[in-house]
Swiss-Prot record:
Catalytic reactions on record: N(6)-[(R)-lipoyl]-L-lysyl-[glycine-cleavage complex H protein] + glycine + H(+) = N(6)-[(R)-S(8)-aminomethyldihydrolipoyl]-L-lysyl-[glycine-cleavage complex H protein] + CO2
Enzyme class: oxidoreductase
A Gene Ontology BP annotation from the UniProt entry: glycine decarboxylation via glycine cleavage system
UniProt similarity note: Belongs to the GcvP family. N-terminal subunit subfamily.
NCBIfam families: PRK00451.1
Pfam families in the record: GDC-P (PF02347)
Role summary: The glycine cleavage system catalyzes the degradation of glycine. The P protein binds the alpha-amino group of glycine through its pyridoxal phosphate cofactor; CO(2) is released and the remaining methylamine moiety is then transferred to the lipoamide cofactor of the H protein.
Gene transcribed to yield this protein: gcvPA
Keywords of this entry: Oxidoreductase
Database matches in HAMAP family: GcvPA
Name of the protein in question: Probable glycine dehydrogenase (decarboxylating) subunit 1
Region forming the signal peptide: none
């Protein structure tokens, strides 16, 4: 019995309509060597036999210890979180337009907004964006709309911004007349030299983007850059790891007046690694800019009987109300991921988040210190970091990473793809899930691999 709902004639008609010659052509962007022509399953096997076959194949997967980081982080997620998220009341992609039928979901989003505003020190938060990269792109568009005093649509970006974020930012803003200037990082400390900003002092910018911790794991001179930006009439967009804010000062405390908009990737707070997603982006801002904020915003109100309730608010900003004048064409939020993050933050509390962040930093410090004791291995930058650090190796880093996989360790992020000067460098990340025994195994594996490949 075939479970495919379409007949061959129907498939041909659909392909003709879109101008494709075959179903395979719909997937031609996938390289041929990655495609499977068959599932290699015998004909006529029953469901029990099929399940046993799949289990045997699944057992061939190797679960390496992960030290990669670079924007997606391995944190422990208590079992209770996704048990609650998977309940039918939450397990939906529905956007809660009908407040009278959605009070539970709306309250979760409201609690999320409250927590994110508190974590970042801002006045308001939206209900989330697609991911960290799109949250940054929307933040740039928001800043340009909001900065009425700016005489240009130029944005200044510190070079150590996550490269994927920069590519997404350029893609989304490509046809909107927005220009970007890049401030080169200091090769000695892996972050922006504030004195270099004076080279851009004669250019009018609508916004300045600061990532801290930056892509290389270093803590930026957020006070100096923020004050410089405000002095020159630019809004400050902070890109940050929410977990780091449990032990670092909030963007609201950067410089004399704080950042204006804060965004980033929410994956570290309750969302598992899953081949790139789904994750969620967060965005918070000062109240002065809230009417230019994209996405859903949930507010708390009272009904005619004086009962407390929740509803979507400031909806005139959104495309389902005023399409031509909407702040964005984003038409949903990552509600399920937001639910997980809300439960995660509620379950851990402020002290729990601080403990996770502190242990992550301490484990990274220990790993880096022990690696630097190995002959030929060193810490590249002599500056403060959170839970990622760049390590210089005496061998090609890509080869090292490949060899470490044979030791069941994902050793770190190969930085040669990011910058040609870093071909012998990797970025390593440790979190609270890495034990002292794990770190010892990493050190011993490093010695073994370097001896094997000639380091």
């Amino acid at each position: 019995m075939s479970f495919i709902p379409h007949k061959l004639e129907q498939i041909k008609k659909m392909l003709d309509t879109i101008g494709a010659s075959s179903v395979d052509q719909l997937f031609d962007e996938i390289p041929r060597h990655l495609r499977a022509d068959t599932l290699n399953i015998k004909d006529g096997i029953n469901e029990i036999q099929l399940a046993n076959l799949m289990r045997k194949r699944a057992n061939k997967n190797h679960h390496n210890i992960n030290y990669i980081g670079a924007g997606a982080y391995s944190h422990h997620i208590p079992a209770a979180i996704w048990d609650i998220v998977a309940r039918g009341e939450f397990y939906t992609a529905y956007t809660p337009y009908q407040a009278e039928a959605s009070q539970g979901g709306l309250q979760v989003i409201y609690e999320f907004q409250t927590m994110m505003a508190g974590l970042t020190g801002m006045d308001a938060s939206n209900a989330s964006m697609y991911d960290g990269a799109t949250a940054l792109a929307e933040s740039v568009l928001m800043a340009i709309r909001s900065n009425k005093k700016a005489k240009s649509q130029k944005v200044l970006i510190a070079e150590a911004l996550h490269p994927t974020y920069l590519r997404v930012l350029e893609t989304i803003t490509k046809h909107q007349g927005i220009e970007f200037d890049i401030v080169n990082l200091d090769s000695k400390n892996g972050k922006t030299d504030v004195t270099k900003l004076e080279d851009f002092a004669n250019t009018n910018y609508a916004a300045v983007v600061i990532q801290s911790p930056n892509f290389l794991g270093q803590l930026a001179d957020v006070d100096g850059i923020t004050n410089w930006a405000h002095k020159h009439g630019a809004l400050v967009i902070a890109v940050t790891n929410p977990m780091s804010l449990a032990i670092l000062k909030s963007p609201a405390e950067w410089g004399d007046n704080g950042a204006d908009i804060v965004c980033g990737e929410g994956q570290p707070i309750g969302v598992p690694l899953a081949s790139g997603g789904p994750y969620f982006g967060f965005m918070t801002c000062k109240m002065a800019h809230v009417r230019q904020m994209p996405g859903r915003i949930v507010g708390k109100t009272v009904d005619l009987d004086g009962n407390e309730g929740f509803c979507l608010t400031l909806q005139a900003r959104e495309q389902h109300i005023r399409r031509a004048k909407a702040t964005s064409n984003i038409c949903t939020n990552q509600g399920l991921m937001v639910t997980a993050a809300t439960i995660y933050m509620s379950l851990l509390g402020a002290e729990g988040l601080e403990r996770v962040a502190s242990i992550s930093h301490e484990n990274t410090q220990t790993l880096a210190t022990e690696l630097a004791k190995i002959n030929g291995v060193s810490i590249r930058f002599n500056s403060a970091f959170f839970n990622e650090v760049v390590i210089d190796l005496p061998v090609n880093a890509e080869t090292f990473v490949t060899e470490m996989e044979k030791e069941a360790i994902d050793a770190g992020y190969f930085l040669g793809e990011y910058h040609s000067d870093l071909a012998n460098s990797i970025m390593v990340c440790a979190t609270e899930i890495h034990t002292s025994e794990d770190i010892k195994e990493y050190i011993e594996a490093t010695k073994k691999v370097l001896a094997r490949i000639g380091g």
